[in-house]
A protein has these predicted regions:
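Short, surface-exposed, charged loop/turn segments at secondary-structure junctions
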Residues: 176-198, 251-254, 549-558, 591-596
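Histidine-anchored nucleotide/phosphate-binding helix
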Residues: 82-93, 390-415, 419
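ATP/nucleoside-binding phosphotransfer catalytic cores, i.e., glycine-rich phosphate-binding loops
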Residues: 2-12, 223-226, 232-330
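Metal-dependent de-N-acetylase/amidase catalytic core
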Residues: 203-211, 215-220, 312-381, 400-404, ...
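Glycine-rich N-terminal segment of FAD-binding domains in flavoprotein oxidoreductases
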Residues: 64-92
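Class I SAM-dependent methyltransferase SAM-binding "motif I" and its flanking Rossmann-like core
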Residues: 181-225
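N-terminal glycine-/serine-/threonine-rich phosphate-binding loop
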Residues: 2-70, 366-367, 374
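Ligand-binding beta-strand-loop-alpha-helix segment within the catalytic cores
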Residues: 19-35, 95-169
Length: 663
């Protein structure tokens, strides 16, 4: 069973010669704008494995010399696969950690001892508890130390690093604001281990571990920039497209305290390891025509023309030969003969992505339409990772499919229970208790007992405490009710609402289990039951460990199994990936764009507002201060404005989709 098919999706088929140059000369040409040696891998797993091999080799070399190997390690998701490979090498290849010394790069402050959401606890779960390291050689900032003792404590932490001969390797991730460790914008080059106040961006990012920003510590004890740069070798890891912009600023931008990771440019043995998604904004990947000759394909040409339009401020059909020649695109003139020929091709390509019939227009010529006319009506399954992703990401298209008489099913893949605040539970408990008092004279003892028990637990609940199974069940019921209300508003029958409650999600914690055969079978059974002609799935591939990606992997794994068995329904099925909750498709990748009128956009907003538990006070709203309906509308309007600026039809908003073809 293949459970990582989403990692094999390559939207732009980047030529290997852009990231795997054949010789040193080609590498120097391609990387001439890059100021830190940067290796690009096809997947996070491949990159992590190479870093793990390098670390393992150093550990062995130090063992032979009878010396310690001193590592500064970060938590978070970026190094997770590196640690997994090191654990595997320990278990299968006998790699010993007896000579390894580990220093935790940072720790939240203040924090209770042994808090489950501490950075040190994450390191223990990912690495330390699974290898034979001497626990006396593991050091972490003390998150309980008295405030008046912090300065001296940080000095001693630095001294302890020096007592082992300094750091051999620092393994870093890059934060959303370009931070390394918790050295945030404004950190000085000569800063050492210290207490630092976390800004809103860092606290928002950390809130994923603590459930809400209110529960997130306001400060951290972190190794300083100078401490990190004292390491003999530094690896900066970044996986996924959400890191792409900060990687570009770190690698290609100037050294600046606004991007602390850029300080690595001053180190003579720093290396950046990224996957293709995180490399997406580097010049040699995003704009290769600026550094080398190109292997042109339709998407790269479309990307180049859109870039040229934005650079010149012209719509497609007004671009001239001069525009191409002056901006590094003369190769396209040689290929097509003139600007006019290129312009017409790309204009028509984009024009053909626009359709008001997302399920196909019946009795119409579908030669240049993104979706087939037949069969009509179609059976459609919309997979929604959380109970509101369907309306946030494709609420306009969903409503259009229903109005055009297609048989629409919505499959809510997870309960979404941990994203409901405790105050919502209390509100519904009051309702249930009041209902019991008014209509049952308080005679239902189960309600009375649960009301008292759950209220008491929530009142005494401390930071880091997990919800009980009863509380998680109530939170799941709240989200089910909201999803049903939204479906009813969009005229989807309630028997077409499927709550899959995939088991991988039900840990009660932010960290989920890997998907299993049980998850895939649940999805597969629904597909066999409905036999859809169209499937819509989440295409948010930015976070390799996010629920959206895991849910999509479950769908793709089920489709792959059906394909292997020769399922007849799959031969007539098209699969479309949507975005919208966290990002939007790049225009060069869009294959279907569904226009939304002002009235339809208002209806979409109303659908999203049915999910009241996900409004202002909801956990996991992310770094974006806008509410989900605001983000969604802004992205949809932005897509329409981009099409308009290129000289295409002007619409109020647009939802965009990319077709997935089973591998």
């Amino acid at each position: 069973m293949k459970t990582n098919l989403s990692s094999q999706i390559t939207l732009n088929r980047v030529s290997p010669r852009y990231y795997r140059p054949e010789n040193a000369f080609e590498r120097s040409v391609l990387t001439r704008l890059e100021k830190i040696p940067t290796d690009i891998y096809e997947s996070a797993e491949e990159g992590a494995n190479q870093i793990a091999l390098d670390i393992a080799q150093l550990i062995r070399d130090k063992q032979k010399a009878g010396r310690f190997c001193v590592l500064a390690l970060a938590g978070g998701n970026s190094p997770r696969n590196v640690y997994a490979d090191l654990v595997r090498m320990h278990q299968e290849e006998g790699l010993s950690f007896r000579n390894v010394v580990i220093f935790n790069l940072y720790e939240y402050y203040p924090l209770a001892p042994n808090a489950i959401n501490s950075n040190f606890n994450a390191l223990k779960e990912m690495l330390i508890d699974h290898v034979d390291i001497d626990k006396q050689n593991v050091f972490t900032p003390d998150s309980t130390i008295a405030k008046d003792a912090i300065f001296e404590y940080c000095r001693l932490y630095e001294q302890r690093i020096e007592s082992f001969g300094g750091l051999d390797i620092a393994l870093l991730g890059i934060g959303r604001v370009g931070n390394i460790g918790f050295n945030e914008p404004g950190s000085r080059l000569n800063s050492t281990t210290r207490l630092i106040l976390l800004d809103n961006d860092s606290r928002n990012e950390a809130s994923k571990m603590f459930g809400s920003i209110e529960n997130t510590p306001i400060s951290s004890i972190t190794m300083g920039v100078a401490t990190i740069l004292s390491a003999k070798k530094i690896y900066l890891l970044a996986w996924g497209e959400e890191k792409a912009q900060k990687v570009k600023e770190c690698v290609e931008g100037p050294v600046t305290d606004t991007i602390p990771a850029s300080y690595l440019q001053t180190h003579n043995n720093a290396h950046v390891a990224i996957d293709l998604s995180a490399a997406a904004n580097l010049t040699r990947i995003q704009r290769p025509w600026l550094v080398t000759s190109c292997e042109w394909n339709d998407k790269l040409i479309r990307s180049a023309i859109v870039w040229l339009c934005q650079l010149t401020g012209k719509p497609i059909l007004k671009l001239t030969n001069k525009d191409y020649n002056e901006n590094g695109l003369s190769e396209l003139l040689a290929l097509f003969g003139s600007a006019y020929n290129v312009n017409i091709k790309i204009f028509n390509d984009l024009q053909h992505t626009i359709t008001g019939w997302p399920g196909g227009k019946p009795n119409a010529d579908d030669t240049y339409r993104p979706e087939r006319a037949k069969p009509y009506p179609k059976r459609v399954v919309v997979f929604s990772p959380h109970p509101d992703d369907d309306v946030i990401s494709m609420g306009g298209t969903l409503r259009r499919l229903v109005e055009q008489k297609h048989d629409v099913h919505v499959a809510y893949e997870t309960s979404g229970n941990i994203a409901v605040g405790d105050e919502e539970v209390i509100r519904f408990l009051h309702f249930i208790n009041g209902f019991n008092q008014i209509f049952n004279n308080s005679e239902d003892q189960v309600i009375n007992d649960k009301y008292t028990e759950i209220r008491k637990y929530l009142k005494e609940k401390k930071d880091g405490d997990m919800d009980t199974r009863d509380i998680l069940t109530i939170k799941g019921l709240i989200r089910r009710g909201e999803a049903r209300t939204a479906c009813t508003y969009n005229n989807i029958p309630l028997d077409h609402c499927h709550f899959l409650d995939l088991p991988f999600y039900e840990t009660g914690k932010i960290q989920k289990n890997p998907i299993s055969e049980a998850d895939v079978e649940i999805v597969r059974n629904l597909l066999r039951e409905v036999k859809p002609h169209q499937i819509f799935v989440a295409g948010d591939l930015a976070d390799p460990h996010g629920t959206h990606r895991v849910c999509t992997d479950a769908v793709f794994a089920a489709i792959d199994l059906e394909k292997e068995e020769g399922a007849k329904w799959l031969k007539e099925c098209r699969i479309w990936m949507y975005r919208g909750a966290w990002a939007e498709w790049e225009i060069e990748n869009i294959e279907m764009a569904v226009p939304i009128s002002p009235e339809e956009l208002r209806a979409k907003r109303n659908s999203i507002l049915k999910h009241q538990s996900q409004m202002e006070s909801a956990p996991f709203l992310g770094n974006d201060e806008r509410l989900f309906w605001q983000r969604s509308e802004d992205r949809n309007r932005g897509t329409a404005a981009l099409y308009d600026s290129l000289g295409l039809a002007s619409y109020e908003a647009m939802e965009a989709f990319v077709e997935y073809i089973p591998l």
